[in-house]
From Swiss-Prot:
Disruption phenotype: Significant reduction in diarrhea in C3H/HeJ mice, moderate reduction in bacterial colonization in mice.
Name listed for the protein in its UniProt record: Probable E3 ubiquitin-protein ligase NleG1
Upregulation: Transcribed for 2-5 hours after treatment that induces type 3 secretion system expression.
Keyword Glycoprotein attributed: no
Localization in the cell: Secreted; Host cytoplasm
Reactions catalysed: S-ubiquitinyl-[E2 ubiquitin-conjugating enzyme]-L-cysteine + [acceptor protein]-L-lysine = [E2 ubiquitin-conjugating enzyme]-L-cysteine + N(6)-ubiquitinyl-[acceptor protein]-L-lysine
Chief location: secreted
EC annotation from Swiss-Prot or TrEMBL: 2.3.2.27
The family this protein is said to belong to: Belongs to the NleG E3 ligase family.
Enzyme class: transferase
GO biological process, one term: biological process involved in symbiotic interaction
InterPro entries on file: Effector_NleG, Effector_NleG_sf
Gene name of this polypeptide: nleG1
Length: 194
């Protein structure tokens, strides 16, 4: 997917969006919005010149000088370091990961998983989840870990990495329950026929 940047965003639209955000927030208040599938956290600090919102890999800005035009604002933002990659969409965007988590969530039962009870504990909650999701330990791993689907969804929403390997989470790492089996010899869940 291609990044959506300032060159692809009408300056007047960016001006209108950031001006609206400024009016919706009060001093020292935190909030958030979704722009092109990314959550952008907004923190308003009283300042008549600059208003910025920063999210996971995203930055929007509103530089307001009396009489400034959208073209001047565009030039100022382009000059600011780090703005060139504004509003990226990628395979690992939270929305596509959340969709994959929803697709692969299943009801956890010992009968279905055929594994020791302790292997059904989520490494995040340290409890057996009611609803679980299997996640490969890394992109090229055949080993999977069972997570509580709500906890894992929250981790993805917050921009976290894989809790065990610290690797960035990709949609291809989230596996449906019919593709995982407990391997007694290895003592963990693995991709079937691997």
């Amino acid at each position: 997917m291609q990044p959506v940047g300032l060159s692809n965003t009408p300056a007047s639209s960016l001006l209108n969006e950031t001006a609206e955000l400024r009016h919706q927030t009060t001093p020292r208040q935190l909030g958030g919005i979704r722009i092109v599938g990314e959550i952008v956290d907004i923190s308003y600090e009283p300042n008549d010149v600059v208003f910025f919102g920063v999210g996971r890999g995203v930055m929007i800005g509103d530089i307001l000088f009396p009489g400034s035009s959208a073209d001047i604002m565009r030039e100022l933002l382009m000059a600011h370091s780090g703005v060139r990659g504004i509003l990226q969409q990628q395979e690992n965007a939270p929305s596509s990961l959340q969709t994959r988590i929803s697709e692969c969530t299943f009801s956890v039962s010992q009968e279905k998983l055929q594994c020791p009870e302790e292997e059904m504990r989520c490494p995040v909650t340290l409890e057996t989840p009611e609803k679980g999701v299997f996640v490969k330990n890394s992109g090229d791993s055949s080993v999977c870990t069972l997570f509580d689907s709500s906890s894992f969804s929250r981790l993805v929403r917050d921009g976290g990495v894989h809790p065990l390997t610290r690797e960035p989470i990709k949609a291809s790492m989230i596996v449906s329950s019919d593709k995982c089996v407990y391997d007694n010899a290895k003592g963990n869940f693995v991709i079937k026929n691997s």
